[in-house]
Amino acid sequence: MRKRLLKIMAGSALALLSLSLLSGCGKSAAKAGSAGEVYVYNWGEYIDESVIEQFEEETGIQVVYDLFETNEEMYPVIEAGGVKYDVVCPSDYMIQKMIENNLLAEINFDNVPNFKEIDSRYTEMSKSFDPENKYSVPYCWGTVGILYNTSMVAPEDAPTKWSDLWDEKFKDNILMQDSVRDAFMVALKSLGYSMNTTDEAEINEAKELLIKQKPLVQAYVIDQVRDKMIGGEAAVGVIYSGEMLYIQNEVKDLGLDYSLEYVIPEEGTNLWLDSWVIPANAENKENAEKWINFLCRPEIARKNFEYITYPTPNKGAFDLLDPDFQNNKAVFPDEDVLQNSEVYKYLGDQVDSLYNEAWKEVKSN
């Protein structure tokens, strides 16, 4: 979600250079649309560049492609309307906020026949933020879990619950997410509460639990959790499932004498979903729908998954994957493992302020 800060590589010169070559222009050029263009606003490192090239070749539509780093950076750009993007890829809770503030256009699904390829499991998940599935088409999904190093954690001590992150045996070896909602999700779930609670008493209880945990935490991190865990710098870390294929490949390529295992805690976790939406002021709406439809083609969705490694909600693409991918439970967990999980919801500015103030207290304590 984010929110998905772990997937953000937008700051790398390589990513920016390659995308600028593809688009031929940046945000300043996105102020004027034409029938032969589509203006795309997406996370960094979140599409196979050859997919963009193939779309341009097949449709004759020029893709102007810009990057954002967080949902919170993206939202005011769309709200202000000065830069008229045609298609954007926000996360669940931010899509809800955009719908509530009339920032999105309804998608004409007659122009997106490949929507049928999206597994009903994920269209049902979408209803938590897009109740009638009018405004969004799922692109990628995943979970948040605990990664642990088998050389630093004995089998009998392997974490199975969020509450294990308060165990003294992991002192100075815990990596927590440096994100208000993700940190509070861990605490709230360990207390048996909803990660979308609006109850001030529950939020405060979670705050006190996070403060209690601080002496055990080595660091609050974002992107660094992946490399720190691969480097054996910590025993356990909170991480997004989309990182797992990269991590597993790195461990293998480096010939490490340990493995890094991923666990979805039994209290449940955050199920996140990033989806394509069309801003209400889009000037190339039909081209945006062609873009979405193209990305829903099973062979395109498979190709894209193999590049970005974040789980695809496309059932046709899943059927085309190598069995090693299909059977990787860190990436595609069984449904029963997810029974107690939730999708983040937009809680409103007042409740957001409660969380933000509580997080400030945690970090400053």
Set out the residue ranges of the language-model regions.
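Early extracytoplasmic/lumenal segment of secretory-pathway proteins
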Residues: A30-M98
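A bilobed periplasmic-binding-protein/Venus flytrap-type ligand-binding module shared by bacterial periplasmic
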Residues: G145-M152, K189-G192, W272-N284, K303
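Conserved C-terminal helix/tail region of periplasmic/extracytoplasmic solute-binding proteins
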Residues: E335-N365
